[in-house]
Amino acid sequence: MVPIKLKGRTISRGCAEGEILISRDPISFLGSVDPKTGIVVEEKHSLAGKSIKGKVLVFPHGKGSTVGSYVMYQLKKNGAAPVAIINLETEPIVAVGAIISEIPLVDMLEKSPYESLKDGDVVQVNGSEGYIELIKPKGSKIEE
């Protein structure tokens, strides 16, 4: 397999590896995600009922209140946060939340993550150098 590596823009430094969870819907961390469990509680959201805990969360951008940054921090303190985030374009609420929570975040990839990635793929997000790398496609027989 030829490795897929996509360059992007660094928003929050750090490196993390995990399984992709994709949403085409924006996320408001205040009111849409339970800060204790990491479960998306917004009924009409595409991720309703799913946990973002330990995932590499892919979504277009954030929405809603500036308090969302502190909800992200609360998720991290509760062990319920995503391990990394990939956005199409990050806005200040999610950027601040990722930085204060030390969650690696990359956006503006050279190719849309919706074209390159799918739920269950394992990727590394390198927020320090501004890239993501597909480690293991979903269903791959590659041994870890």
UniProtKB/Swiss-Prot annotation:
Example of a GO biological process term: isopentenyl diphosphate biosynthetic process, mevalonate pathway
UniProt keyword Mitochondrion present: no
SUPFAM superfamilies named in the record: LeuD/IlvD-like (SSF52016)
Enzyme Commission designation: 4.2.1.182
GO molecular function: hydro-lyase activity
Keyword Ribonucleoprotein: no
Enzyme class: lyase
Pathway in which this enzyme or protein is active: Isoprenoid biosynthesis; isopentenyl diphosphate biosynthesis via mevalonate pathway
Active-site feature positions: S65 (proton acceptor)
Family affiliation: Belongs to the AcnX type II small subunit family.
Function per UniProt: Component of a hydro-lyase that catalyzes the dehydration of mevalonate 5-phosphate (MVA5P) to form trans-anhydromevalonate 5-phosphate (tAHMP). Involved in the archaeal mevalonate (MVA) pathway, which provides fundamental precursors for isoprenoid biosynthesis, such as isopentenyl diphosphate (IPP) and dimethylallyl diphosphate (DMAPP).
Protein name per the record: Phosphomevalonate dehydratase small subunit
Species the sequence originates in: Methanosarcina acetivorans (strain ATCC 35395 / DSM 2834 / JCM 12185 / C2A)
